[in-house]
Amino acid sequence: MRSFLYGVLAFAVLARSSAVAAFPIPDESRPLSKTSPDTVAPRSLRIEAQEVIQSGRGDGYGGFWKNVAQSTNKIVKRPDIKIGKLIEAAKKAKAKMTKS
């Protein structure tokens, strides 16, 4: 039983030392996975409300993207609302409600 314990202990020490030798510095492997924004290739991922429109048969083109829904990224001009006028109108309406 004691020899089995020594064998397991030796295996654990060897496994740990080989794992440590594989990555001696924990942050050493990270620079390979990190990329700067200027080197990242632009990605063309399909987003919601897009579909592939097939081109003619046998012409060698696989298709192109068509935007099915209208874009929601448009800037919408908000109406100019005078808060003071709204408060005055609310006070007048409240006064009418209390009189009747």
Curated annotation (Swiss-Prot):
<comment type="function">
    <text>Secreted effector that acts as an elicitor of hypersensitive response (HR) specifically on plants carrying defense protein Rpi-blb2. Enhances P.infestans colonization of Nicotiana benthamiana leaves. Interacts with, and subsequently prevents secretion into the apoplast of the host papain-like cysteine protease C14, thus promoting virulence by interfering with the execution of host defenses. Associates with calmodulin at the host plasma membrane to interfere with plant defense-associated calcium signaling in hosts.</text>
</comment>
<comment type="similarity">
    <text>Belongs to the RxLR effector family.</text>
</comment>
<comment type="subunit">
    <text>Interacts with the host papain-like cysteine protease C14. Interacts with the host calmodulin.</text>
</comment>
<keyword id="KW-0472">Membrane</keyword>
<feature type="signal peptide">
    <location>
        <begin position="1"/>
        <end position="22"/>
    </location>
</feature>
<keyword id="KW-0732">Signal</keyword>
<feature type="short sequence motif" description="RxLR-dEER">
    <location>
        <begin position="43"/>
        <end position="57"/>
    </location>
</feature>
<keyword id="KW-0843">Virulence</keyword>
<dbReference type="GO" id="GO:0020002">
    <property type="term" value="C:host cell plasma membrane"/>
</dbReference>
<keyword id="KW-1043">Host membrane</keyword>
<dbReference type="GO" id="GO:0005576">
    <property type="term" value="C:extracellular region"/>
</dbReference>
<feature type="short sequence motif" description="Calmodulin-binding motif">
    <location>
        <begin position="78"/>
        <end position="82"/>
    </location>
</feature>
<dbReference type="GO" id="GO:0016020">
    <property type="term" value="C:membrane"/>
</dbReference>
<keyword id="KW-1032">Host cell membrane</keyword>
<keyword id="KW-0964">Secreted</keyword>
<protein>
    <recommendedName>
        <fullName>RxLR effector protein Avrblb2</fullName>
    </recommendedName>
</protein>
